[in-house]
Amino acid sequence: MSEYVFDIEADGINATKIHCMVANGKEVDKDFFVNLKPEDTLIGHNIIRYDIPVLEELLGIKIKAQLIDTLALSWYLFPTVNRHGLAQWGDRLKIEKPIITDWENLSLEEYLHRCKEDVKINTKLWNLQKSLLIKIY
């Protein structure tokens, strides 16, 4: 059983292209997702409504791993917080989230930098959430 904090960068909400994919701080490819086992866990922010559907649709695969969505956990664990996005969590956790306004014309390095920083933020957020869940349950 392995745990992977991941993120993707794609060309927008109605994605037609995935620019890059990162898990545990390293760039991954389609084979990474294909080879996941049911006992593996994928952790990400808004993965249930965005990343997983985009991966399954554009890569033509079915993700077999268990899923933990840190956005849903954020709503649950921090109900009085107004904004639950990764940018806001980056501010709270002191990790700057790179801003991207062009989702089609940047270099792979620029998309990868953003993706890796998102994984850093989300890893720190997941560790915080996990510690709170352990205290609660």
Language model features: what each stretch is:
Residues D29-L36:
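Short acidic low-complexity segments
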Residues M1, P38-D40:
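A general structural motif
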Residues N14-T16, A23, E27, D40-I134:
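Active-site-proximal helix-loop-helix substrate-binding element of RNase H-like nuclease domains
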Residues M1-M21:
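Entry/capping segment at the start of metal-dependent catalytic domains
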